[in-house]
């Protein structure tokens, strides 16, 4: 080993010592993988929602219904529409069912698997309990009510020409041949099968519980004493949202 290499190693060691002195380790915790919610914990994000206006009981907008399509990975959440500010009763009646105004809006998003190993952690009684996230989703307001209203209008109107009984005069029919050069090297990308699979899959309703039960969810983040020496088997039947 040359003198320059020895000098470089010595300088690196001095820098590490200085870093440890500036940012010392003040406490260590034993780490446990909690089995209670493993593979069942989802993180919901609301990119268009201000931090001070959460969908919660305090703001009168706690989620009412939650449903998912497990295979295609779609999620919908129904939340109340606040009527104290910026509420248009005419529009609400327009997009309602015809008898009463619309009272909820639907948030939708696609469930995604985390690209990194995201986890939720809880420090309690000098122990660090962690649970891996099964997935995350970004929920945004959807235009579901507008689409339903548009479809209702189309269904009521029926075929444009057959309903009136009149026909539009047409010019002479001419044959037009259109040819397109086929690129055999380009990859064939089609989303038709994805759309069809999404439409055919049935929604699975989930149990939506009030915020006051969140403490029980936090309790499940803790690894029970009897399972702390060894990991427990996972359960894949329930979802929990944070």
From Swiss-Prot:
Residue ranges of coiled coil: none
Database matches in InterPro entries: RNA_pol_III_Rpc5
Main location group: cytoplasm
Segments crossing the lipid bilayer: none
Listed GO MF terms: DNA-directed RNA polymerase activity
A single GO cellular-component term on record: nucleus
Disordered: annotated segments: 1-22, 153-172
Keyword Transmembrane helix set for record: no
Compositional bias of kind Low complexity: 155-172
Taxonomic superkingdom: Eukaryota
Location relative to the cell: Cytoplasm; Nucleus
One of the protein's GO biological processes: transcription by RNA polymerase III
A Pfam family reported for this protein in Swiss-Prot or TrEMBL: RPC5
Keywords linked to the UniProt accession: Cytoplasm, DNA-directed RNA polymerase, Nucleus, Transcription
Main function: DNA-dependent RNA polymerase catalyzes the transcription of DNA into RNA using the four ribonucleoside triphosphates as substrates. Specific peripheric component of RNA polymerase III which synthesizes small RNAs, such as 5S rRNA and tRNAs. The RPC53/RPC4-RPC37/RPC5 subcomplex is required for terminator recognition and reinitiation.
Record's subunit section: Component of the RNA polymerase III (Pol III) complex consisting of 17 subunits.
Name of the protein this chain belongs to: DNA-directed RNA polymerase III subunit rpc5
Organism this protein belongs to: Schizosaccharomyces pombe (strain 972 / ATCC 24843) (Fission yeast)
Lineage: Eukaryota, Fungi, Dikarya, Ascomycota, Taphrinomycotina
């Amino acid at each position: 080993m040359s003198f320059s290499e020895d000098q470089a190693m010595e300088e690196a060691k001095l820098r590490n010592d200085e870093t440890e002195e500036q940012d010392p380790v003040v406490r260590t915790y034993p780490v446990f993988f909690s089995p209670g919610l493993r593979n069942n914990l989802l993180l919901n994000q609301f990119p268009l929602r201000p931090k001070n206006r959460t969908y919660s009981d305090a703001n009168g907008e706690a989620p009412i219904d939650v449903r998912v399509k497990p295979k295609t990975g779609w999620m919908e959440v129904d939340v109340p529409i606040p009527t104290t500010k910026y509420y248009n009763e005419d529009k609400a009646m327009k997009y309602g069912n015809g008898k009463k105004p619309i009272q909820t809006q639907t948030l939708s998003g696609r469930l995604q698997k985390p690209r990194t190993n995201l986890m939720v952690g809880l420090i309690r009684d000098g122990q660090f309990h962690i649970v891996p996230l099964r997935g995350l989703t970004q929920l945004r307001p959807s235009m579901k009510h507008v689409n339903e209203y548009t479809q209702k209008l189309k269904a009521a109107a029926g075929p444009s020409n057959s309903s009136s009984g009149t026909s539009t005069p047409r010019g002479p029919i001419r044959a037009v041949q259109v040819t397109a050069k086929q690129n055999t090297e380009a990859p064939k990308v089609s989303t038709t099968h994805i759309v069809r699979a999404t439409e055919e899959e049935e929604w699975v309703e989930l149990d939506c519980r009030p915020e006051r039960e969140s403490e029980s969810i936090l309790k499940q983040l803790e690894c029970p004493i009897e399972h702390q020496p060894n990991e427990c088997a996972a359960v894949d039947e329930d979802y929990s949202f944070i």
